[in-house]
Amino acid sequence: MDQFLPFSRPAIGDEEISAVEKVLRSGWITTGPQNQQLESEFCATFGCKHAIAVCSATAGMHITLMALNIGPGDEVITPSQTWVSTLNMIELLGATPVMIDVDRDTLMVSASDVEAAITTKTKVIVPVHYAGAPLQMDALREVAKRHNLPLIEDAAHAVGARYNGEWVGARGTAIFSFHAIKNLTCAEGGLIATDDDQLADRLRCLKFHGLAVDAFDRQQLGRKPQAEVVEPGYKYNLSDIHAAIAVVQLARLPQLNARRKALAQRYLTALEGSPFLPLGLPDYPHDHAWHLFMVRVDAERCGIDRDQLMERLKEMGIGTGLHFRAAHTQKFYRDRYPQLSLPNTEWNSARLCTLPLFPDMTDADVDRVVKALSSVVESLRVSR
């Protein structure tokens, strides 16, 4: 049998290993100069005014919602077709997530659906860039401006994506993930990009105990050692070990994303006319980051359902993923919002299957996956 092919694998090389070794030998391994370099180079790369590195995108979402004073009685509009962390943060702050449906093919929210969900209790809109494709930001910004609401982009999937020629994160506020499977990874980490000066100041405070400065500021930059807690905060800072990896990955991102794009195009060409339905591409100008390559497995079209296909592929040495089971179908949210019906979300949630896609894959790996999909379909035809 061929070697097992996972659905994702981090593209870590000698440069990342050397960067980590350098930090370990430096005597300063927690938040410090590598964080500062990461934030500075992220701003230079994507044109954002402020970049605040954090230990995860979830942490970034938490303190961003906190900084906007989200709490009991407030509503936050966001899709259910996303990872549950955003919904969890909204709930943990005592607010109510208003989950809306997504486009059946792109899995992203529309400005019209967002606007229809706005009430007097709405305090923030959190749309999600999906699988590497950017949202149609102009229309969403118009809705947010019309109703005087902050717009916080969940850009966990979208580092290196562009909408209408503009990098995701270049303006407004966007939250990125550097988790192990992301296009830019440092194992665990995240970053908040914003052009709001006051928000940036509060985020830096909230991410580190509510202190105005961190340990590196105090010990290395000669700032006042008696830092004061100005409000209760969290321990959401990123270590320099992680930041050093992210700095290298940021420099490599154009090449890493280009390889993802080439692999995705190979999939799209090979799967044309097959019963497996890739996600639709946005019909507006964009540059796709190809974080994930997903197909929808409809039992009527394919002769097999999603879960059965994933098991068959596993037996053939091919890993797959599910991104994601809709949040409102999870037990906590199902019990809490039993009447919620989101047809497009539910249709996709039952059929989504993530196929292997990572920069170190070969063209032959893609061909192997496509051949496996074809053989499953053919075996079902023969057995009928």
Curated annotation (Swiss-Prot):
Needed cofactors: pyridoxal 5'-phosphate
CDD domains given in the database record: AHBA_syn
Organism this protein belongs to: Serratia proteamaculans (strain 568)
Reaction(s) catalysed by this chain's protein: UDP-4-amino-4-deoxy-beta-L-arabinose + 2-oxoglutarate = UDP-beta-L-threo-pentopyranos-4-ulose + L-glutamate
Keyword Lipid biosynthesis in annotation: yes
Keyword Lipid metabolism set for record: yes
SUPFAM superfamilies recorded: PLP-dependent transferases
Signal sequence coordinates: none
InterPro entries assigned: ArnB_NH2Trfase (IPR022850), DegT/StrS_aminotransferase (IPR000653), PyrdxlP-dep_Trfase (IPR015424), PyrdxlP-dep_Trfase_major (IPR015421), PyrdxlP-dep_Trfase_small (IPR015422)
GO cellular component annotations of the record: membrane
Listed EC numbers: 2.6.1.87
Function description: Catalyzes the conversion of UDP-4-keto-arabinose (UDP-Ara4O) to UDP-4-amino-4-deoxy-L-arabinose (UDP-L-Ara4N). The modified arabinose is attached to lipid A and is required for resistance to polymyxin and cationic antimicrobial peptides.
Gene Ontology molecular function, alphabetical: pyridoxal phosphate binding; UDP-4-amino-4-deoxy-L-arabinose aminotransferase
Complex formation: Homodimer.
N6-(pyridoxal phosphate)lysine modified-residue sites: 182
Keyword terms: Aminotransferase, Antibiotic resistance, Lipid A biosynthesis, Lipid biosynthesis, Lipid metabolism, Lipopolysaccharide biosynthesis, Pyridoxal phosphate, Transferase
The family this protein is said to belong to: Belongs to the DegT/DnrJ/EryC1 family. ArnB subfamily.
Record-level GO BP terms: lipid A biosynthetic process; lipopolysaccharide biosynthetic process; response to antibiotic
Protein name (record): UDP-4-amino-4-deoxy-L-arabinose--oxoglutarate aminotransferase
Enzyme class: transferase
HAMAP family associated with the record: ArnB_transfer
PANTHER family: TRANSAMINASE, UDP-4-AMINO-4-DEOXY-L-ARABINOSE--OXOGLUTARATE AMINOTRANSFERASE
Pathway annotation from the record: Nucleotide-sugar biosynthesis; UDP-4-deoxy-4-formamido-beta-L-arabinose biosynthesis; UDP-4-deoxy-4-formamido-beta-L-arabinose from UDP-alpha-D-glucuronate: step 2/3; Bacterial outer membrane biogenesis; lipopolysaccharide biosynthesis
